[in-house]
From Swiss-Prot:
Species per Swiss-Prot/TrEMBL record: Stenotrophomonas maltophilia (strain K279a)
Disulfide bonds: none
Protein task: Catalyzes the addition and repair of the essential 3'-terminal CCA sequence in tRNAs without using a nucleic acid template. Adds these three nucleotides in the order of C, C, and A to the tRNA nucleotide-73, using CTP and ATP as substrates and producing inorganic pyrophosphate. tRNA 3'-terminal CCA addition is required both for tRNA processing and repair. Also involved in tRNA surveillance by mediating tandem CCA addition to generate a CCACCA at the 3' terminus of unstable tRNAs. While stable tRNAs receive only 3'-terminal CCA, unstable tRNAs are marked with CCACCA and rapidly degraded.
Record text about domains: Comprises two domains: an N-terminal domain containing the nucleotidyltransferase activity and a C-terminal HD domain associated with both phosphodiesterase and phosphatase activities.
SUPFAM superfamilies: Nucleotidyltransferase (SSF81301), Poly A polymerase C-terminal region-like (SSF81891)
Cofactor note: Magnesium is required for nucleotidyltransferase activity. Nickel for phosphatase activity.
Chain residues that bind CTP: 8, 11, 91, 138, 141
Name of the protein: Multifunctional CCA protein
The organism's place on the tree of life at top rank: Bacteria
Length: 406
């Protein structure tokens, strides 16, 4: 029996980045031998065990053979005779196919992963790459993480990703897994690389058609020097990641705020009148298909519907501001307002030449929200009021508070 550290922990060590979970591969062992040493079996589809003290995952070396459609259509062989090199060969990218003997510090790198780390290239391990459609999503997600380090996708790997997209295999991806990869990309340093990689691989359309529909749609150059709505979408996603690092609620709402522009009739280009209302339908469709959590959908709908109103909040009547807050459920969910402000700021700054622009509207929104929130029904004299009259009096008092906070 021989144990090696594999995968992301080895890769991140070589990149001099903090490592996440430690994954281990065990060569030359059987499940019975693992359990005899105190390991607990947890793998459903292949033999994975938890270490009795650390709780880290130890998987028996295995090979995988394609047996059906999708990323679950594989036959697994975890015979004790499977070698380390055979186990590494089934992995997706060379940078993830490096093992380390922790006793000696020796690296086992049969597929050139160290070279590709040095050259900042994301490259597939072998021709079996095309057997798993999930790898297209993983490539895009890794690019969202590693593009800031200078990584690019190898041309031959991109060609295989396009082959997968053309095969129809992407249709076999389950919604939960698509959302899982998208969510990870949104909290990466450069979500735009996720979008751009899928777009270049012709995979964004099959997976996220609402987002693909924005590429090639022009906007008015005086407001959007980047012109292409798809590029604006990328810039807004990166700005959201910068303004709210690690917040996938902000990331998702910022990503989907302009979906309505993909539905603008071409004869109306480059104007997109009513795109904020038009965007709700494709947003709902995307959320239903990927089973997006309700909290994410509610914030995204609020940002999609109201971002133009927030941009011009100084022009809105005080009563209109209160109505805006009500539509966002901001008086019942006050934590939502700061995120809406961040999404709108990402929209305003996610434009060519506007990356460092101020966005005072965000502070105005938060200030007026606090003013409205400071007035509660218990603060009013409602002795002679009943039913709807109490609500009307509360609304009037809140409008007055908003006016005073201007």
């Amino acid at each position: 029996m021989k144990i090696y550290l594999v995968g992301g922990a080895v890769r991140d060590r070589l990149l001099q980045r903090p490592a996440g979970d430690h994954d281990w591969v065990v060569v030359g062992a059987t499940p019975a031998q693992m359990e005899a040493q105190g390991y607990t079996a947890v793998g459903r589809d292949f033999p994975v065990f938890l270490h009795p003290k650390t709780g880290e995952e130890y998987a028996l070396a295995r090979t995988e053979r394609k047996s059906g459609r999708g990323y679950r259509g594989f036959v697994v062989d975890a015979d004790p005779g499977v070698t380390l090199e055979e186990d590494l060969q089934r992995r997706d990218f060379t940078i993830n196919a490096i093992a380390c003997d922790e006793e000696t510090g020796t690296l086992v790198d049969p597929y050139g992963g160290v070279r590709d780390i040095e050259q900042r290239v994301l490259r597939h391990v072998g021709p079996a790459f095309v057997e798993d459609p999930l790898r297209v999503l993983r490539a895009a997600r890794f690019m969202a993480r590693f593009a800031p380090l200078g990584f690019t996708v190898a041309e031959e790997t991109m060609a295989l990703m396009r082959e997968i997209a053309a095969s129809g295999e992407l249709d076999a991806l389950v919604p939960e897994r698509v959302w899982q990869e998208l969510r990870k990309a949104l909290v990466s340093e450069r979500p735009s690389a996720f979008l751009r990689t899928l777009h270049d691989a012709h995979a964004l359309g099959p997976i996220l058609p609402e987002l693909e529909a924005l590429y090639g749609v022009p906007q008015r150059a005086e407001f959007h020097p980047e012109v292409d709505t798809g590029i604006h979408q990328e810039m807004v996603s990166d700005m959201a990641a910068k303004l709210a690092p690690g917040d996938d609620l902000v990331g998702f709402a910022a990503l989907t705020h302009d979906l309505g522009k993909g539905l603008t009739p071409p004869e109306e280009w480059p104007r997109h009148i009513m795109h904020e209302q038009r965007g709700i339908k494709p947003l709902k469709a995307l959320c239903a298909r990927l089973k997006i959590p309700a909290e994410h959908q509610q914030l995204a709908e609020a940002v999609c519907r109201e971002h133009l109103n927030v941009h011009r909040i100084d022009e809105l009547r005080d009563a209109t501001v209160l109505e805006l807050l009500g539509r966002c459920d901001a008086l019942r969910r006050p934590e939502r307002v700061a995120r809406i402000a961040l999404c709108c700021e990402a929209d305003k700054r996610g434009r060519l030449g506007f990356e460092d622009a101020d966005y005072p509207q965000g502070e105005t929104l938060k200030r007026l929200h606090q003013a409205a929130l400071s007035v509660q029904a218990r603060d009013l004299d409602t002795t002679h009021l009943k039913g709807p009259a109490i609500g009307e009096a509360l609304a009037k008092a809140r409008v007055k508070a908003i006016a005073a906070a201007r």
